[in-house]
Design a protein with these regions (language model features):
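Catalytic/RNA-binding core of pseudouridine synthases
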Residues: 1-230
């Protein structure tokens, strides 16, 4: 493989590692492999630290394809906790509010999910990498500044309920969506539509375009993968 000329590397990002952290580590290993100080490397779509799954890295001239990969359809599996919310819409922050759930049934969930399929408007999380006057929204939030983000048009191709436990009020979904979709925001909006609350307890990106997570390199085995290359 010619990393300096350009390659596409798909890795399975682990839990609690930022996309930039994963990129920096892989870039270091690749640069060491080819014997240069720094191989040009970029990623094609951020995954939250608490999310796992497909992260596409491009090196050299292949970084020009990053936008192309960002346009590809993505598939996720996610688990939601109903009846509560957190400021980040996931488990990065503690629960800040609780809501009734006794009215929530499988039938109601199925009915609500259909309303999110197609072209919809979605407001990104305040704890996100969206820019506000040049600053990242999450950086402003951590400084105690109020952040108001505008709703953006997104497209959801498929939204399936794969599991619902009425005892724990946990539900799992499979989502196929276009660029710019925040699954954390989708969780928040599903909670609102159920006249309750919801936040993510697990998120995994299982596909980007034709690249599936089963075909990705395990992050912990990247050095072994590089060692096997000639």
């Amino acid at each position: 493989m010619d990393f300096q000329s350009g390659e596409v590397i798909a890795i399975d990002k682990p839990y609690r590692l930022s996309s930039f952290g994963a990129l920096a580590h892989v870039r270091y290993l690749i640069s060491k492999k080819v014997g240069v100080k720094r191989v040009k490397t970029g990623h094609a779509g951020t995954l939250d630290p608490l999310a796992t799954g497909v992260l596409i890295l491009c090196t050299g001239k292949m970084t020009k394809r990053i936008e192309e990969f960002q346009q590809h359809t993505k598939e996720y599996t996610a688990t939601l906790q109903l009846g509560a919310t957190t400021p980040s819409y996931d488990m990065e922050h503690e629960v800040d509010q609780t809501f009734p759930t006794s009215h929530i049934t499988r039938e109601l969930i199925l009915e609500v999910l259909t309303t999110f399929v197609g072209d919809i408007m979605q407001t990104p999380p305040a704890y996100s990498a969206c820019k506000v006057n040049g600053d990242r929204a999450y950086e402003l939030m951590r400084k105690g500044r109020e952040v108001e983000l505008k709703a953006k048009p997104i497209h959801i191709d498929e939204l399936d309920l794969t599991h619902f436990d009425a005892a724990t009020m946990q539900m799992s979904i499979r989502v196929v969506c276009g660029k710019g979709t925040y699954i954390r925001s989708l969780a928040r909006d599903i909670g609102l539509a159920l006249h309750s609350g919801a936040y993510l307890t697990a998120l995994r990106r299982t596909r980007v375009g034709d690249i599936r997570v089963e075909d990705c390199i395990d992050y912990d085995h990247i050095q072994k993968w590089l060692d096997a290359l000639r």
